[in-house]
UniProtKB/Swiss-Prot annotation:
Plays a critical role in the incorporation of lipoproteins in the outer membrane after they are released by the LolA protein. One of its GO terms (biological process) is lipoprotein localization to outer membrane. A lipid is attached at C30 (N-palmitoyl cysteine). It is found in: Cell outer membrane. Residues 1-29 form the signal peptide. Transmembrane segments: none annotated. This is Outer-membrane lipoprotein LolB. It holds the Pfam family LolB. The lineage of its organism: Bacteria, Pseudomonadati, Pseudomonadota, Gammaproteobacteria, Legionellales. Keywords: Cell outer membrane, Chaperone, Lipoprotein, Membrane, Palmitate, Protein transport, Signal, Transport. Belongs to the LolB family. A lipid is attached at C30 (S-diacylglycerol cysteine). One of its GO terms (cellular component) is cell outer membrane. CDD domains: LolB.
Length: 210
């Protein structure tokens, strides 16, 4: 008599396939996360209230960049493309040589991760979905705000530079550092974010803003 049910066997096969895919992502990724060349930016001097207002009005963007996740015994490096339209988004995560990729599409209350046209998974939050399917702890809901250089709704502690750029933030158990900004049109936007939460460290590079 088999000690593993059909459902358990199917679940093990799915997890095994995901593990293989993640291994491909790790092998094909770069060994270091390189920063884009520093462009010359003329920063805008504003009050924090005005800067927050301008940044909070940005609700559509196309971003491409790279990120790394460091946790005990494992380091993940990958590239990404993030398309945002209002509260709807589509994020493609892929290896440097495009050997492996996943697509995440979401709207409030519904997030789907696609590993192939026929293989997809759903959850109510992106954090839940990525933890279940990829084993990653990424505060994607809050990153919607943090990548614009503003806090997410809720309590926070923050530090600012002389231009009132957000340079350090503590929120929802995360410590975030904004080490570079770049001028895009009439606003200054982050280029690098460093996040930490206990033993977990995440670095996000935003190479191009549109």
């Amino acid at each position: 008599m088999s000690l593993i049910s059909n459902n358990e066997e199917r679940s093990l096969r799915v997890r095994y396939c995901i593990a293989i895919a993640l291994s491909a992502l790790l092998i094909s990724g770069c060994t270091t996360l390189r920063l884009p060349n520093q462009s010359t930016s003329v920063y805008h001097q504003q009050t924090w209230a005005q800067r927050y207002y301008d940044l909070s009005r940005i609700s559509q963007w196309n971003i491409d960049g790279a990120f790394s996740i460091q946790q005990p015994g494992k380091t993940i490096i990958a590239a990404y493309d993030w398309q945002q339209k209002g509260m709807n988004y589509r994020i493609r995560i892929h290896s440097s040589l495009d050997i492996y990729s996943v697509n995440i599409s979401g709207r409030p209350g519904m997030v789907t991760l696609w590993r192939s046209p026929r293989q997809h998974y759903t959850a109510s939050t992106p954090e839940q979905l990525m933890q279940q399917q990829l084993g990653w702890q990424l505060p994607l809901s809050n990153l919607y705000y943090w990548i614009r250089g503003i806090p997410a709704p809720g309590a926070y502690q923050a530090d600012f530079d002389t231009y009132t750029h957000l340079i350090a933030l503590q929120q929802s158990g995360w410590h975030i550092r904004f080490s570079q900004y770049t001028t895009v049109g009439s606003v200054d936007l982050p280029r690098t974010l460093q996040l930490s939460n206990g033993p977990l460290a995440v670095k996000i590079v935003l190479k191009h803003w549109q």
